Structures are given as C-alpha cells and as structure tokens.
Amino acid sequence: MTYPKRIPLNAWSDALKAAKPLIITFDAYNTLYATKLPVMEQYCIVGHKYGIKANPLTLTKNFPHVFKKLKENYPQYGKFSNIGPEEWWSSLIKNVFAPIEIPDEMVSEILLRFEGFDSYFVYPDLINFLKNVKARYPNIILGIISNTDPIFYKLLKNIGLYETFADNIYLSYELDLAKPDKAIFEYAFNDIIDKRPDLLKVYSKEEICQHCFHIGDELKNDLEGAEGAGWTGILLDRNDKYGYLSESLDKTVRDEYKLSLDKIDNHSIKTWETSSKQTDTIQLNKKKYVVSNLEVLEELFP
C-alpha cells in the first residue's frame, strides 16, 4: 500500500480497518475538551470585572515566552521547586498580564473559571464515540495519558468525564514521565495489564500492543509518541493545523512557539463546526492515522 492514503468515509472496507481495540487512551486538553473562547479572551473577561484593561492579543503575544520560561525554571508545574500547580499557574497568569499588576482575587477567579464548563466545551463526538465504542466492545479499556498536573482531576470531575477514565489516568506530573517518551506509554500499558491479567489468558503482551490506540492533537507527543511505543497513533487534528487533511504538508512542522499558541487560541465551538464537515481519514502508515473528528474514527475499527 502506498502512503499517505486518503480514505473517504464511504470507502472503508474490512481490508482497510485496524485491529479490534482492546485499549484506547486519550490526550486531555484539546482532545477530550477545549476552551469555548481563546484563553486570553477569557482572562480579559475576568480582568474587566476588576477594572483591568488588557488586550487579548497582547496577552497572546506574551504567553509563549512566559510559558516557556516557567517550564524551564519550574519543570513539571513546580513539582521539584516546592511550589504547587496552583502557584505555578498563578505565576503564569500574573506574568502574562505584566507589566499590568493584577489582584490575587482576580487570579483566583481565573483559576476557578478554568475548572469546568465556564471555560471548557466537551466535543459532542467524544460523548458519542465513548458511548458507541463501549457498546461495540464491552470490555474495552479506556484511559488518559497527558502531560499535565493534578488540577486536571478537578476539571475532569466537573465536566463529567472522570468516571469514564478513573481507573487508568496517567499524568506526567505524577509519573515523572512525559510524552513523547515511550516510557509513559509503556508504564500505562504495564499498569493496565497488571489490573487486567485476564488479557494475558487470551493474548501475549506483544499481541495486546497491536490492539492499543492513543488519540491526541499533537503530532510529536501523541501520534509519534504512540507509534514509538508500538501502539497505533491517531492524530485528532480538528483545525487541520498539520495540513495532512488538506494536503498542505508544508504546515506539518510546528515549533514550540506555534504549539504554545495552540494551547490558548482555540475557539472550540467554531472548531467543532469546521471539523465535523471533514469526513476523510489520512493513513500515514500501518500505525498512524489522521482524522478531523471522532465520528470518522469509528470506521477504523472492525
């Protein structure tokens, strides 16, 4: 087969489908959920209540440098620097607004806003995908592998997704491992097998690996990270930011600056409207796929 291969929605056949899924893990931010409005617009909405006049475009320009510096000075959200994740994010918020000084009460309100549906939107296709995949494969194991901090648990509970993934959540902060390193995928794999030894009565570990899938929105961390661990990687590219779906492959290289902006510049409702119209799947090789939405992805499985 020649790659990359474009597979229209009406062209799927048994020969094109992947293996039956036993384990599916997801990235978190911009995969399970995303911001309703760009992050800096939301910061400014809160700021307005406190008399702070700031331009979202200016804050957006400030963000990549502030984010990069904090990650370098206080890696893993401050875990090794005697500061907690909330203090780490508070510092980010204050530095993004600098030189404007903002009150602590405003910082607290911004943090609270980003703990649930005030800020976030859960894509409708995710809810349908989870429902359908559990109906088709009652013993499917669902999990999360994310480079994030424990504040995530509060958010996941508030948006109603915690119970779906509760037994299999793997965070970089807690494990001192991070995507795209295959070690975090291997840790998740071995932990799941330890919890579900019944799988080894039917499959070898090598065989189980052929039935593992990871879904996420970043090329390096999710698609290539999963492939490096022997899993099938699925790039969920709702905005075609990497260019595979439109065959604009000059877009595939995204540096740290662009990736930083991806984290804050999403308008998820508009993104959903756009992504739901794209129904092709791009297969890059036997272990890598690109889709625009999860409705399309259901066709991948037998």
What are these regions (language model features)?
Residues M1-L22, I127, K131, G143-P302:
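Asp-based, Mg2+/Mn2+-dependent phosphohydrolase catalytic module
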Residues T2-N128, K134-P138, L142, P150-K154:
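N-terminal helical cap/lid subdomain that shapes the substrate entry/recognition surface
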